[in-house]
Amino acid sequence: MTTFPRTVGVIGLGAMGTPMTGHLVAAGHDVMVLRHSLHKADGARPVDEPRHMASQADVVLLMVPGAPEIDALLPHLADGAAERDRERGGVVIAIGSTVSPDDVTRWHREHPDLTLVDAPVSGGEAGAVRGELSIMVGGAPSEVTPVLDVLAACGRPVHLGPLGAGQVAKACNQLICAAEIVALAEASVVAERAGLDLAELLELMQGGYAGSVVMADKTPKLVAHDYAVSARASFVHKDVSAYLDAARATGTASVLGGPLRDAAQRLVDAGLGEQDSAVFQRWVAERGAGEDATASTPDPSGTARALPGDRSDQPTPWTPGAGRDRTEDER
């Protein structure tokens, strides 16, 4: 992919956004951050408001926690986009946060004058630091090019389909991750109670069929019972809820989604949601023997809202069975 310097705004300099911003600066892009975050972004320049960012940038990357933060930001970004000199072209808002595909569709409807591309990332904080993220991009082919160009500095961006396709892909990714995290947590409790050396066991498992990036990442925390946060446990509920939205939209009765979401809700209700997701280990250990994780049969349909009709003058949002319209070098 041919890259050249662009003006990029980044909002959300947390565990993921901070190293990503560093890679964007290192790649030679003109990077803007909000003034209160400037101390986290060597080489970037400050702006006072999101509106100012949207009025100047080619791409604004949102790496905020979730949909409520994006709901609050988009009106200001829309104001900034409206102030742009027409000769400079429009700004693309790249949604790097993990949200429901339904949220992306709703924002597309509520802000028709904004160019939206969804670009959630996977690889965790370690992947962000290494610049080796898997980046799942959804949007119109004519609109994803600057996002693919910019995010190449942070990992491997791949255009998967129309607007919303990136969030569907990330939702599927997160179901698998959530299942692994909860399974690891529960298995670790059983193993320790049976007298096994957990460190030795997980090292052995890592070399077998159960081995995974998730296991490698969580093993030190599970062995040490260390729940210092790197990825908040409450995000499991948010992410699995997004997966259930995608499952509902495709007419899929989820087997794992409902129980995982309900387990995550109970963990949050127990006051553990702000700790690392490895805290599922503690939550499992503190529950009574034979206690069911769910009080009732979960709704397999999730919480999705109905998808609105397409607008002929806007990028086509993701819908079940939507075709892929990509150039060969984006595959």
Task: Please place each PLM-identified region on the residue numbering.
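Hydrophobic residues within alpha-helices
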Residues: 20-24, 107, 190
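Active-site-proximal catalytic alpha-helix in oxidoreductases
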Residues: 135-137, 158, 163-194, 205-217, ...
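NAD(P)-dependent dehydrogenase/reductase Rossmann-like domain
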Residues: 271-331
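Rossmann-fold dinucleotide-binding core
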Residues: 96-174
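Rossmann-fold NAD(P) dinucleotide-binding segment
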Residues: 49-114
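Interdomain hinge/lid region at the active-site interface
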Residues: 163, 211, 217-277, 283
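NAD(P)+-binding Rossmann beta1-loop-alpha1 motif at the extreme N-terminus of oxidoreductases
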Residues: 1-61, 125, 153, 158
